[in-house]
Amino acid sequence: MAQVPPSLQDLANRYNQAQAQLQSVLLRKQQYEAELREVDKAISEIEKLPQDAKIFKSVGNFLVQQSRDAALQELKDRKELLELHVKTLAKQESMLREQLEKLKEELNKELAKLRGGQEAAKGGG
């Protein structure tokens, strides 16, 4: 069996690294999107409540009373931050997918060269 050229091994390592990064980005993006859905649902429910409704938020092991407006503002701020995270991760996802495509093309070229060299060696004997 032929030895794998260092250039091909390097490309394969870079490809695997980029794939792992993409998986990490996708996981974080999914987590933020799930939290964003929860925040949207909470905002929707709180907006239905009367102005003087008692609202409590969890702080560690305690429930602390909060005004409706303060709760809404806190949730809207959180929503804005989550949307920013999702947008940033979507950009990273796009860049990583492009990087993976380029690395895949490079890997295929290197493999084609390697196969071509092996075919020439077999045919030339």
UniProtKB/Swiss-Prot annotation:
GO terms for cellular component: cytoplasm; prefoldin complex. GO terms for molecular function: protein-folding chaperone binding; unfolded protein binding. It is found in: Cytoplasm. GO terms for biological process: chaperone-mediated protein complex assembly; protein folding. The keyword Cytoplasm applies. Molecular chaperone capable of stabilizing a range of proteins. Seems to fulfill an ATP-independent, HSP70-like function in archaeal de novo protein folding. NCBIfam families: gimC_beta. Heterohexamer of two alpha and four beta subunits. This is Prefoldin subunit beta. It comes from Pyrobaculum calidifontis (strain DSM 21063 / JCM 11548 / VA1). The lineage of its organism: Archaea, Thermoproteota, Thermoprotei, Thermoproteales, Thermoproteaceae.
